[in-house]
Amino acid sequence: IKVKYSSLNFKDALSASGNKGVTRNYPHTPGIDAAGIIEKTSGSKFKPGDEVIVTGYDMGMNTSGGFGEYINVPQEWIVKKPDNLTLSESMAFGTAGLTAGLCLRKLLTHGLKPDDGDVFVSGVTGGVGIISLMLFKKLGFSVSAITGKLDQEEFLKSLGANQVIDRNTLDLDLISPLQKPIYSGGIDAVGGKILSNLICST
């Protein structure tokens, strides 16, 4: 695949910094996302000229990744680019967009609706968080954005956050296993004590 676009993810930074839990062998080319054009294939699923996306699996970890000019990966790792996205747009979403989309789809499958009440997004200034906020807003939800970067409040509200909450108010030992219900659901990109407190108020 001739790579046209990639995106930068936290896992790429871990790989580049020598984290052996992500990448075992160096030298190495990171990039867990790639969008490009098939130039040659030994499989039957795709043909030369197809515009495709690769995200996840082992690419960019222990298989040369999307920051290279070319990638050579199993056809099972490849998906055809949706017709309504350009190659560059698909990488604007990348792994972060895929993660946010999968989370939101699971919530909607379980019946979450805007009328059910406020939802939260923690870690909202990261890739998964920002895309989650925008997707929730597009579907008509009222969103509480939880962040440690309060200087980004105006930016988050411009993306659709109804309120911005200081994560330090949630980064505490569990206040109570049953707290007053505040949220009908949410997407967490932080974990730990923050997630524990959010679960108890959902």
Residue ranges and their predicted role:
Residues 1-8, 19-59, 65:
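Glycine-rich beta-strand-centered segment in the early N-terminal region that forms part
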Residues 37, 50-51, 70, 118, ...:
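Residue-level marker of beta-strand positions
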Residues 47-48, 86, 113-114:
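Residue-level recognition of short, solvent-exposed, well-ordered loop/turn junctions
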Residues 72-80, 84:
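Structured surface patches comprising rigid loops and adjacent beta-strands/short helices at the edges
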Residues 91-169:
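Mid-domain Rossmann-like dinucleotide-binding core that forms the NAD(H)/NADP(H) cofactor-binding site
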Residues 112-113, 144, 159, 163-202:
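Glycine-rich cofactor phosphate-binding loops and adjacent beta1-alpha1 units
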